[in-house]
């Protein structure tokens, strides 16, 4: 076993030399020194609301077209900030002009912003995206419009009443090669016959029509329900009573009842409804910061406490002139309510397809 001793000593010597060389050649480890970064100054947001509220005795007098609203602190009446004005938690933008406070330019405080215009959102129908305000035709029978996330459609195929005099048994049938249905009489089924024509000579004599258009079928659809159950809304209809005899959409403003007035206390004892409510004083109509040139004392539909809906029964359309603080004035058609009644048939005014449910091919809108 003596012959193993030299070899063992040699191996130990080689290992020791290797460790010494590795230690000598390896870089000296550096010590990492972490220096803490200086802390940023604490961001302080100014406080624009003070409690308890301190309001002036009289509300401010706002310029013509500027809304008088409650401030963001829910304390005092202020004149709403307009487009491009600075806005804060207290000084809010004019909601009647579709403005909101954009704080993106005041990072990272987000305390003072600028009043900007609200941009309506688009719509998606059958996987196709449409921008706000865009009109499109999903098929040849309907024309649709995207309005702030909601799609509203109007039928393009106008269906006048069937003829009563010369047609014995009228039938509403599809015609090959045409999109819309037409009235057909059994006495002459080989070719479709039109309904009673609009006598344009009477309109020409009154100056309403400058040129006579043959084969013009006069049609005016009923007004759609008001888009809101309270406050300012809009209703539409389709009519081709014009010089071109072309179907056009007409609109009018509507206000069934005020949102900020509780009509229920006005119901007499023992009664279940109040058909008509009328304010005591005449006021001006306001629209997008513009004010009507004259005052009105309109009638509003009341409320029913027995699950019935109070809707207009007799009404008409009037023209109201508005004056704006900047720029020329304009006129709008407005619903004028004469009488209301409580009806058991209640429907959601925002259901834009409610009037189409009675159509046999209602499902074609989504095809």
UniProtKB/Swiss-Prot annotation:
UniProt function note: Downstream regulator in the Wnt/Frizzled-signaling pathway. Associated with cell survival. Adheres to skin and melanoma fibroblasts. In vitro binding to skin fibroblasts occurs through the proteoglycans, decorin and biglycan.
Source species: Rattus norvegicus
SUPFAM superfamilies from the UniProt entry: FnI-like domain, Growth factor receptor domain, TSP-1 type 1 repeat
Biological processes, Gene Ontology terms: bone development; cell adhesion; glucose homeostasis; negative regulation of chondrocyte differentiation; negative regulation of fat cell differentiation; osteoblast differentiation; osteoclast differentiation; positive regulation of cell differentiation
Protein known as: CCN family member 4
Domain TSP type-1: from-to ranges: 215-260
Signal peptide: 1-22
Coiled coil among keywords: no
Record localization: Secreted
Domain VWFC, chain residue ranges per copy: 121-186
Domain CTCK: 273-347
Keywords tagged on the record: Cell adhesion, Disulfide bond, Glycoprotein, Proto-oncogene, Secreted, Signal, Wnt signaling pathway
Sugar-modified residues: 86, 143, 284, 343
Gene Ontology annotations for the cellular component aspect, listed alphabetically: cytoplasm; extracellular matrix; extracellular space
Disulphide bridges: 49-73, 53-75, 55-76, 62-79, 87-101, 93-115, 273-310, 290-324, 301-340, 304-342, 309-346
Occurrences of domain IGFBP N-terminal (ranges): 45-118
Similarity comment text for this entry: Belongs to the CCN family.
UniProt-recorded Gene Ontology molecular function terms: heparin binding; integrin binding
